[in-house]
Amino acid sequence: MTESTLVAGSTDTPFVIAGRTLRSRLMVGTGKYRTPDEMVRAIDASGAEVVTVAVRRVSLDRSRDDGVLAHLDPSRYFLLSNTAGCYTAADAMRYARLARAAGFNEWVKLEVIGDQDTLLPDTAALLEATHTLAGEGFVVLAYTNDDLITALRLEDAGAAAVMPLASPIGSGLGLLNPYSIRTIKHRLSFPVIVDAGVGT
């Protein structure tokens, strides 16, 4: 077994986003764990390099022993701020800027939710926020639906990658529309990261 097969999602083809080469194609979050220790052990076992942090839901005070950030080594993991829970472009942009001011890098997983029940994205607001944040120097990874036209517009708006959902967040339904995801992948010139509902 080669070293690359030991790293989650690794292939022999480099995975590059906005000039940064990542050793793993798997990204994991920090939510829903019972304890910080469980979170750390799960992330470590995953082999992921990129860890998303929902800015609205965590303390950005790294000195707090009970905070998520106190348990994640930034020299080991690439911490990606996430605007999960934001329902307007203005709200998402506010939290992206807050994360950067608090010491995160300029990367952001941009989410603008349009429906509270399904957590499907508001693509019009997402496009607005993407255009503005990309203009401010953010590297935007946009959580979106599996629509090719929206993905193309996000590329034009300055996104560095799109993250089309496999199925609604938390549904565990897996990849519902492989044709749409495949079409997006073939048509876009930058990375496509399948996100949400992928199951376990």
Give the positions of each predicted feature.
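Alpha/beta enzyme core
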Residues: 12-17, 32-50, 63-78, 86-200
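Short, well-ordered coil/turn residues at beta-beta hairpins
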Residues: 29-30, 54
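Short secondary-structure junction/hinge motifs that connect adjacent elements
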Residues: 59-61
